[in-house]
Amino acid sequence: GEQKYLICNADEGDPGAFMNRSLIESDPHAVLEGMLIAGYAIGASKGIVYIRAEYPLAIDRLKRAIGQMREYGLLGKNILGSDFSFEIKIKEGAGAFVCGEETALIGSIEGKRGMPKSRPPFPAISGLFQSPTIINNVETLGTLPNILRNGPDWYTRFGKEGNRGTKTFSLVGKIRRPGLIEVQLGTTLREIIFDIGGGVQKNFKAIQTGGPSGGCLSEEFLDLTVDYESLASAGSIMGSGGLIVMDEDTCIVDLAKYFLDFTQKESCGKCVPCRVGTRHILEILERITNGEGQPDDLLALRTLGDTIKKGALCGLGQTAPNPVLTTLRYFRNEYLEHIKDHRCRATVCKPLIEYRVIKEKCTGCQSCVRVCPTGAITGPRSEPHNLDASKCIKCRSCYEVCRYEAIAGDAIVIRTAERQS
């Protein structure tokens, strides 16, 4: 019959996300057995695990597990005496974020540059080497053996109407207990952050869901349930399952700039909306964080973001503006503070801050003197120190080590830089 392929997408490239890698490293057989089941279901005879080369331990364990399956007759010709034959190979990717998109991933396996293609035809009709191809991620395939073993009724006990089952998340950021978690779909963000993650040490500010192209949600969404429709209604996405928690020390504008810088660099450059649009958004964000923003920039950001979402070729471009659009929607005041007041409330944007020692609070412990890389802080022990602003590179080292700032509040404080005429 017609050659069919099954591909396991293990190209996990979100910053701070490590769900797929951990599953493969800890239980590669669950994923491979899921591929075997899926291959049998669709009539495929060849399976490929596409995984980035930066995961050497996961790759090693996959190879060992594949070898063990062959030893037990679970791979190869006529598996267990049946007429079903199936082989699994590993394809190591070069780490391009865009290759997580299915058509770009297929191009990479074929030895081409990883660039998305317009659809239709969809991979299920014409995919790898123009043959019918089904692509699933690690978590989906790893769940199949348990569903078959326990039955669909067991699986649908978890979750909520329309979103059954569980989801693995990577919970990172300013959280007391970071790590991998598995929760039922429909669990609230409040339960995830405060009950499971232990909350944050300082005041909670926001949570980023869905990785670099996800949305940034404010405190008002803590009781939002984590499911596909609810996140989409708030302007975010589920994505691969990355959750980044932020506190009051996070600058929302700088955060949006960080994620746009990532997606702009990872863009394949094929379509104009993504290639040019993300660059223009990044340039505007850089101006704002440098204290050179204009009131019209906010409208420009929204217009560009909406245009990119509508015109980009693939999911990377269509979701790239999400961090900007959601922060504009829920944290507009921080943008206005950067533009109108030349103030960064989180004291992150260097051109908008200025360090100084408060003499009344300084005990002369010299902690700041020892960590200052430029010698900008001087003074004898047990006496208030001096800070030479001309030497200060605003690295925050002094601010971070000052015990008295942390306890009393402002042994070393940051004030808004004077607006230049």
Residue ranges and their predicted role:
Residues 2, 10, 19-24, 46-47, ...:
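Ferredoxin-type iron-sulfur electron-transfer modules in oxidoreductases and energy-metabolism complexes
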Residues 46-66, 86-88, 200-233, 329, ...:
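Terminal amphipathic helices with adjacent charged low-complexity linkers/tails
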Residues 34-38, 185-201:
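Short amphipathic, charge-patterned alpha-helical segments
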Residues 8-20, 123-128, 170-175, 379:
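Gly-rich Lys/Arg/Thr-decorated short loops/hinges at beta-loop-alpha junctions or inter-strand turns
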Residues 267-270, 361, 391, 401:
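Short pre-active-site segment immediately N-terminal to redox-active cysteine/selenocysteine motifs
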Residues 2, 59-185, 197-199:
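Hydrophobic alpha-helical positions that pack around
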Residues 1-113, 359, 390, 421:
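Iron-sulfur-cluster electron-transfer modules
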Residues 163-177, 183-185, 345-393, 397:
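C-terminal accessory/binding modules appended to enzymatic or scaffolding proteins
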